[in-house]
Amino acid sequence: MADTATGSPTSHGHVSPFVEIARADWAALAPATHLPLRETELVQLRGIGDRLDMREVEDVYLPLSRLLNLYVTGTKKLHRDTSAFLGERAKSTPFIIGVAGSVAVGKSTVARLLREMLARWDDTPRVELVTTDGFLHPNAELERRGLMERKGFPESYDRRALLRFVTQVKSGVPEVRAPFYSHLAYDIVPGAEVVVRQPDVLIIEGLNVLQPAASGAKLAVSDLFDFSIYVDARTHDIAQWYEERFLSLQRGAFSNPRSYFHRYAELSPAEAVARARGIWSAINEPNLEQNIRPTRSRATLVLRKDADHSVANVLLRKL
């Protein structure tokens, strides 16, 4: 018996806000015209450990990009009609997509791929991607608050700054700036910024983008999304992917003397596995279970992955 994104059964008379679509049925929804995407581009978009291939793109992400294109077109028309009804001049505002999910689940790859595919549709040539990493408090501030071991948890972010950024973009501000985060330094880079200039589509990717409003706040970042995606998988599969990614980084990026995690570069294979599992158990799994997965039911669409990273089925919120 299949489960919905809320964890409730989809059969035996139970009501769900989602319709569950098997991969084969979803793939059949792909438009006849293929969007141009070369294998060399796919290699650049693929995350560490992700097994994304052209078959996956055609079966899963081509139909998704078409669905998003329909949502963009429909939202623009509704905006124009509403402006006409109010007797106002229609002002174009970006269509905002949120992409959420656990560490190592592949949400960054999904976000990058959608950025490239949506930019190939005629009516959305300007697509920007911003990750919420830039809205983490700097390490010095996290240390001051005793939150370094909870980096990635909701309280480690400057949620007001993120909300202000998305509000300004959605309001049509010509140029909006966000802090820049370095994964090498594992910190915000002072003076460096990401600049967003009125895109057709803005993708916001991060662990907690579907979180409800913070205590005392009237608005959540997700309230400003036109569409949201949750990348889902079984916990034990994500844990395995995280371990594989950690080992890959240990052999690669961690060997850079400037890497924040350079101290892990000389670990033995057994020590590296133990360290990866320790980080997962102490930080990433609790964050997934306490904060990230509970937001799954807030998404417009859920991509549910199997152990090999391929999407097995899609859950789409009923209109």
Curated annotation (Swiss-Prot):
One of its GO terms (molecular function) is pantothenate kinase activity. GO terms for biological process: coenzyme A biosynthetic process. It is an enzyme of class 2 (transferase). Pathway: Cofactor biosynthesis; coenzyme A biosynthesis; CoA from (R)-pantothenate: step 1/5. CDD domains: PanK (cd02025). Belongs to the prokaryotic pantothenate kinase family. NCBIfam families: panK_bact. This is Pantothenate kinase. It comes from Clavibacter sepedonicus (Clavibacter michiganensis subsp. sepedonicus). The gene is coaA.
